[in-house]
Regions:
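Structured, contiguous alpha/beta core segments that scaffold functional sites
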Residues: 1-266, 291, 376-406
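C-terminal helix-loop subdomains that flank or include functional centers
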Residues: 11, 16, 38-39, 92-107, ...
Length: 406
């Protein structure tokens, strides 16, 4: 395969991203002198990652969406041994295809973008798939390559890699042919990167985190009131004032709330006193936290019962199954198709086999099934072996006298 050579030039001083001067492509340089910024300062993925590690409800929704979209594994037809092998071993690192899909689903839920590297050779004798952390990937200015770097806040061109966007392959120094798939959620006015669906609720995620932090602060303060300590004392210097304040702090040692010490000239008598600051708005904080959680669920297009967020009326298996069915048809199945469709194309292009039978096994979070379902249908829904021609599996679940747990 011919090598792709591209010249480089120095980036403008105001560009925070260093010009890309190196590549793993044999004898070639990086496809662009810089990348399209992901966010105003090219650090938006870092900010989104930080929020996801601080907001409890936000993180739970992200985790659950990825779990449901990745399903219980992947299956294919019996006449596809190469695809079956890829399902079990997607790469040389021991990842299954389900592992890869789960990471892609998580990245797309968190960033609105996901990246999948495809590796083969000139003879197409093998296929390996590698997930790449989306926060380490940027679109090159030629819009035909993805630049990978481990730390975009301290870019070093010698550590950068360049991979062409699918369907273009480029030969690497190890003799392999590689390309990369870029998944991105569509958003008007955004061409180079997708936008996470929950972006309108980023402030809500921050509110949920800050209300949790406020509760931690109250716990650290042993729920003691904050306030102002008025001290009557005559001081001749700043040092004397500091000494008196330290003595007061020692006297009120322990783990009190935040106390402001104020020294004033001593009048007749000792009028030193503590003026508490009452937090009579605890209910408002709770309401704010609840509203933030509700906004997050709405922005994620998700459902409370599927992420362990309780209703005021409690949980029920019927509600969980109902919300799962809605989520399956409105969120899970479309996301699965978005992730699997390019993978099927890669399999067909590289291995030359039909991958149309590749699909994800979906299973509801509870075992309850309608009694009009046949046994083979129930086993199929649970990802178990089934035989439509088996007379016993043609029976309805109702004939068993109870809801099947097969």
């Amino acid at each position: 395969m011919s090598e792709h050579r591209i010249a480089t030039r120095i980036a403008a001083p105001e560009n925070r991203v260093e010009p890309l001067l190196g590549s793993t492509v044999a004898g070639a340089s990086v496809a662009s002198d810089r990348v399209w910024h992901w966010g105003d300062d090219n650090m938006l993925p870092y900010a989104l990652s930080l929020i996801s590690r601080r907001s409890v409800a936000h993180r739970r929704i992200l985790n659950d969406k990825a779990d449901y979209i990745a399903g219980k594994g992947l299956v294919c037809g019996d006449n596809s041994p190469l695809v079956s092998h890829l399902i079990v071993s997607a790469n040389g690192e021991g990842d299954t295809l389900r592992d890869i899909v789960h990471r892609l689903a998580f990245d797309e839920a968190l960033f609105g973008n996901a990246f999948l590297e495809v590796v083969t050779d000139a003879e197409h004798s093998f296929l390996a798939l590698y997930h790449h952390d989306a926060s380490k990937c940027r679109v090159a200015r030629d819009s035909e390559h993805i630049i990978l770097h481990h730390n975009w806040s301290a870019f070093n061109s010698s550590d950068a890699r360049s991979l062409p966007l699918f369907p273009r392959f480029e030969e690497q120094t190890d003799g392999t042919l590689r390309t990369i798939l870029h998944y991105k959620d569509y958003e008007p006015m955004f061409q180079h990167y997708g936008v996470a669906g929950y972006l309108a609720a980023v402030d809500a995620a921050a509110i949920a985190y800050k209300t949790d932090k406020w509760n931690i602060s109250r716990l650290d303060n042993a729920f003691q009131l904050s306030g102002v300590m008025m001290l009557d004392s005559v001081v001749d210097s700043e040092a004397e004032a500091d000494r008196i304040v330290r003595m007061a702090e020692e006297k009120f040692a322990g783990n009190p709330g935040q106390v402001l010490f104020v020294l004033r000239d001593k009048a007749e008598g000792d009028n030193s006193r503590f003026i508490p600051i009452n937090t009579a708005t605890d209910g408002d904080w709770h309401t704010l936290h609840t509203q933030a959680e509700n906004d997050l669920i709405i922005a994620h297009s998700w459902f409370r019962s599927l992420s362990g967020l309780d209703y005021s009326s409690g949980f029920s298996s019927e509600r969980i199954l109902h919300e799962y069915e809605v989520a399956l048809n409105t969120v899970i199945l479309p996301e699965q198709e978005q992730l699997l469709s390019p993978i099927r194309k890669v399999i067909e292009l590289v291995l030359g086999v039909d991958a149309s039978s590749l699909e994800i096994v979906n299973r509801p979070p509870t075992r309850s099934k309608p009694q009009y379902m046949r046994i083979w249908e129930a086993r199929k829904a649970d990802g178990l072996d089934y035989d439509e021609s088996d007379p016993e599996q043609q029976q309805f679940l109702a004939s068993l006298g109870k809801t099947s747990n097969t």
